[in-house]
Amino acid sequence: HLTLPGYREMDKARDAARKRPIGTTGRGIGTTYSMKSERDGIRLADLDWDEKWNDLDDADKKFLEQFKDKLISMRVNIAAKMYEFRNDNILFEGAQGAMLDLDSGTYPYVSSGASCSAGAATGSGIGPKALDKIYGVFKAYETRVGNGPMPSEFNADTEGELCDYVRNTGNEFGVTTGRPRRCGYLDLVALRYACHVNSIDNLVLTHLDIYDDMNEIEACVAYDIDGKIVTDFPASIPDLNKAKPVLQKFDGWKADITKCTSYKKLPKAARNYVEFIEDFTGTKVGIVSVGADRNQTFVREKIWK
């Protein structure tokens, strides 16, 4: 499905009209999905379908006219192509986060599409049984863009300095909007939930080096909701809004791990932290990253057959 210029304005107007704005990026994605569900959208496959073309808004039609022939020449039958390469190694990379999935995320503060692992099948023309392994990529801390519950978010009044450090060191600013991302402690309750609903085989931990200068680090291991300790991720937005993080402390390592050449050479405190994540989520951390370069990524579990 194609996202057209007019969809952007519709996206912004719809969010502004909401009593509780979601905080959309205003790129027209939500409108594209809405048009798809209402069966009013236009697909790449429809560009030479005159009846569908004539349904377009004049401004969008004029814009699309510039690229129509080029786009038509680039079309392929994705389902057929996927079947052709069925015996090859193919990597599907999802966008956004598990908690923004339309069905299993923090609805209504979610994206309009399937950002869970199941979306790799529905969006690519293959069946779910064709997915051999599912990797879940996460940061060593929590981030969120836009509105919605985030129980482990740093408190602006008491943890503002920590928040600024994590945000600036991790370069946590929206790619589309440039606005600062909300940052917080790693939420292991949410991470475990994401592992369950996405059938994660292995986790991929990134930005571990963010903690290099800290004497101790903390992670959220439960929620305090009205005085009750909750260890399962709630489905209720009111519960999530009331949730206070129950934090567990870990020893820091006070060392520059970006220069480590293997996982085994990481400080023991760093390895202990990784292994706690594994125990808590019940999921192996198969890859650990301590920097942006390829040689700063340690593969602990074989990826391809």
Functional labels for PLM-detected ranges:
Residues 1-305:
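Non-transmembrane, aqueous-exposed alpha-helical and coiled segments at domain scale
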